[in-house]
Amino acid sequence: MSKSKDDAPHELESQFILRLPPEYASTVRRAVQSGHVNLKDRLTIELHPDGRHGIVRVDRVPLASKLVDLPCVMESLKTIDKKTFYKTADICQMLVSTVDGDLYPPVEEPVASTDPKASKKKDKDKEKKFIWNHGITLPLKNVRKRRFRKTAKKKYIESPDVEKEVKRLLSTDAEAVSTRWEIIAEDETKEAENQGLDISSPGMSGHRQGHDSLEHDELREIFNDLSSSSEDEDETQHQDEEDINIIDTEEDLERQLQDKLNESDEQHQENEGTNQLVMGIQKQIDNMKGKLQETQDRAKRQEDLIMKVENLALKNRFQAVLDELKQKEDREKEQLSSLQEELESLLEK
């Protein structure tokens, strides 16, 4: 297709939101919906040179207005048949009109400043006056503060106190008359303590020798007593052997009884482990039944919704969702049957 030279290029629309007091907003809304030709005479917008203030006249009633920046960009849509919508522009500003306000606010005279930081800060403060903290609906009140909070900056940790303490210690060391240092190893101290326990002093040797002679006399008396009582022990030796045989049989019985108790404990532990496994599988089966019931309910609601919808595209979309639910239902049924088979095999054991 050839494009004629007379065709003008398409221009992008520049749009903003106009917010009026309730009584004037209803008047403008009725005039727009009625489609009067004289709408330009009833509604006029005039902006001042600063680009932030202006005057909006509704039926020749002047309203003070201020152009503010919205928290985020919104899309503007246009429709002709109320079915198909077309995007026309991105909106980021709103003209707020009030009854009580200065129609002609005082003009701020620029002040020449040599400091670039001060001038930059002043421009930033000036822009803050025209920042709108709220959205265009009630739930979005203070949305700029709630959604766009300032992030905490990473602060580098400085340690001036530590450096000051190190300098103080170094200065005191330099002023000292003399210094002495000693390295103590933990292993060496332990060895010295062990050696100190084994080595005795020479002053104690005489006392140790006298003590050994007394112990020798006591041992001689004990051996004499033992030799005199050896005959009595021979008489009672036969009786002790019989007692030992009786004790051995009792120990064998106790050992057998202990083995049986251990076997019963092991069997009891195996039964407890099986019971816990059965309870775990039963819990999984109950959960899977709940999920399966929920999936079936969702599929039933989706089928009812498909029956009510007449739009073909929407019906196809709902049908795709229903197919996914059916596949999910089949998978859950397979999982449930496998869990039930596993539970039956455990119960048979």
UniProtKB/Swiss-Prot annotation:
Region (Disordered) residue spans: 105-126, 186-212, 227-247, 328-349
InterPro entries reported for this sequence: TAF7, TAFII55_prot_cons_reg
[KR]-[STA]-K motif, short sequence motif: residues: 3-5
Feature: compositional bias, Acidic residues: 230-247
Impact noted for substituting residue 5 to R: Abolishes methylation in vitro
Pfam family of the protein (one): TAFII55_N
Resulting phenotype, residue 264 to D: 50% reduction in TAF1-binding, reduced incorporation of TAF7 into TFIID complexes
GO biological process: chromatin organization; DNA-templated transcription initiation; estrogen receptor signaling pathway; mRNA transcription by RNA polymerase II; negative regulation of DNA-templated transcription; negative regulation of MHC class I biosynthetic process; negative regulation of MHC class II biosynthetic process; negative regulation of protein kinase activity
SMART domains tied to this protein: TAFII55_N (SM01370)
PTM comment text: Phosphorylated by CIITA. Phosphorylation at Ser-264 by TAF1 in early G1 phase disrupts binding to TAF1. Ubiquitinated by TRIM26; leading to proteasomal degradation.
Subcellular compartments: Nucleus
Keyword tags: Coiled coil, Nucleus, Phosphoprotein, Transcription, Transcription regulation, Ubl conjugation
Annotated GO MF terms: DNA-binding transcription factor binding; histone acetyltransferase binding; nuclear thyroid hormone receptor binding; nuclear vitamin D receptor binding; P-TEFb complex binding; protein heterodimerization activity; RNA polymerase II general transcription initiation factor activity; TFIIH-class transcription factor complex binding
Organ and tissue specificity: Ubiquitous.
Effect on the protein of changing residue 264 to A: Reduced H3 acetylation and transcription at target promoters
Domain description: The [KR]-[STA]-K motif is specifically recognized by the SETD7 methyltransferase, which methylates Lys-5 in vitro.
Further comment: Overexpression of TAF7 in HeLa cells inhibits cyclin D1 and cyclin A gene transcription and causes the cells to accumulate in early S phase. In contrast, depletion of TAF7 from TFIID complexes by siRNAs increases histone H3 acetylation at both cyclin promoters and stimulates cyclins CCND1 and CCNA gene transcription.
Function field: The TFIID basal transcription factor complex plays a major role in the initiation of RNA polymerase II (Pol II)-dependent transcription. TFIID recognizes and binds promoters with or without a TATA box via its subunit TBP, a TATA-box-binding protein, and promotes assembly of the pre-initiation complex (PIC). The TFIID complex consists of TBP and TBP-associated factors (TAFs), including TAF1, TAF2, TAF3, TAF4, TAF5, TAF6, TAF7, TAF8, TAF9, TAF10, TAF11, TAF12 and TAF13. TAF7 forms a promoter DNA binding subcomplex of TFIID, together with TAF1 and TAF2.
Record-given protein name: Transcription initiation factor TFIID subunit 7
Organism: Homo sapiens
